[in-house]
Amino acid sequence: YVGEVGGNLSGGYNNDKTARYADQFGLGVALDLQKLWGWDNTQAKIQLTNRNGQNISNDRIGDPRAGTLSSSQEVYGRGHMVRLTQFWIQHQMFDNKLDVKLGYFGEGEDFNTFPCDFQNLSFCGSQVGNYVSTWYNWPVAQAAIRVKYHITPELYAQIGAYNQNPSQLEHGNGFKLSGSGTKGTVIPVEL
């Protein structure tokens, strides 16, 4: 569970003093498939999320007619609904140098990662996903594969392929696993 309060004490588009609360409930399981079924170096994860509340940036900080560039509460967004956020299997081979992940997950989980140490969206999560309309961050998952190779313990190269499907953003499509609505594929590369 994550809950965030954002307040407007002075200034902004609407300078009335007020606060807004947004939250996210999560339920998930991480599985070590080596311990469960004897599959060497294999893990799986399933995560559901549900977001609720209001964002102080939408009507108090920024002008609602123009929209805002970022959010004061990172946990707000992508609809008030239950979503399948992670549903993947991951396997390491060749002395853990090669790591392959396949399933449903977002680009920001593995590419352009950034810790979330403060509730403002500008300081949280994959920044590409916060500002580019074709890159979906948590809690939106899409069909994906990511292949990472560790060149040295400190250096890796990775490539991914993510189904770019705007219909997954629509209300009621939190568990959509079909490819209908697909516009293409996002292929990030990172060193």
Q: How should each PLM-predicted stretch be described?
A:
Residues 3-7, 48-54, 104-108, 161-165:
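Transmembrane beta-strands of outer-membrane beta-barrel pores
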